[in-house]
Amino acid sequence: MRLLFLVLLVLLGLIQYPLWLGKGGWFKVWDLQRQVAEQRETNDGLRARNTALEAEVRDLATGVGAVEERARSELGMMREGEVFVHILPPGTPLPSDNSTPQASALSKPRPPATPPRR
C-alpha cells in the first residue's frame, strides 16, 4: 500500500511538472500576460501621441494661425508695427543703464559689404 502511494505521488509530480514549469506552463503564461499589459500601456501612450501629432499636422496644413503661433512662440517673431513687452517677475532687478548703449549700437546701420578682390 505504501509503495502504491509513492508511485501515485511520483506520477502526480510528473503530471504537474509541465503544468507549472513546462514550455507553456503557468509561470510562462503569467509572464506573457504581464508583457502584454505593459505593451498595451505603451501602445495607448503612443496612440495618444499620434493623435496629438495628427491634430498638429492638420492645423499646420490648413491654417495660417498655427504657423503664426509657432513662429511667435518658438522663434520669437513679431508682426511689423507690434511692440514687444517683457514683464519681469516680482523681485527681478531692473536692467542697468549699460544696456541702452548696446541697443543703440545694434540699431546703427551697417555699411554695405564689399565683395572680395580677386
From Swiss-Prot:
It is a single-pass type II membrane protein. The lineage of its organism: Bacteria, Pseudomonadati, Pseudomonadota, Betaproteobacteria, Burkholderiales. Belongs to the FtsB family. Residues 28-62 form a coiled coil. Keywords: Cell cycle, Cell division, Cell inner membrane, Cell membrane, Coiled coil, Membrane, Transmembrane, Transmembrane helix. Residues 88-118 are annotated as: Disordered. GO terms for cellular component: cell division site; cell septum; plasma membrane. One of its GO terms (biological process) is FtsZ-dependent cytokinesis. It comes from Bordetella pertussis (strain Tohama I / ATCC BAA-589 / NCTC 13251). This is Cell division protein FtsB. It comes from the Bacteria. InterPro entries: Cell_div_FtsB, FtsL/DivIC. Residues 109-118 have a biased composition (Pro residues). It holds the Pfam family DivIC.
